[in-house]
Amino acid sequence: MLPKVIVHNSISLDGSLTNFEPNMELHYQIAGSFKPNAHLIGSNTIEAGVELYEDGVPPEEEKDFEKPQRDGSLPYWVIPDTSGKLQGLLHTCRRFEFCRDIILLLSEKTPKEYVEHLRERNY
């Protein structure tokens, strides 16, 4: 059986994906209504979201080093980040209430320091 793929984006009335501020709570409520197992989210999207919606990056806390224990019906966030761009930002994703946990897609060229950083935080 092939997986069912749904593309869900928030866009402005003129079709733009940039230069507007979407209601992310509504975005993820709608996305969640499809009952997905996972969301594929780009590292640029994560980086832009942290800049747009966070008042600076909060410091990591002890609980950020543990896998969250959330409802199993929530989707995983699958994020390609082979360069380590999101080092120091991923804990903000893990705290997001509509995210079960983070799955990172890496490559053989991913910096070893980043891989160790992820291991220390149980990603």
What are these regions (language model features)?
Residues 99-123:
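Histidine/lysine/aspartate-rich catalytic loop segments that bind and position anionic ligands
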Residues 1-95, 99:
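N-terminal nucleotide/polyanion-binding subdomain common to many enzyme families
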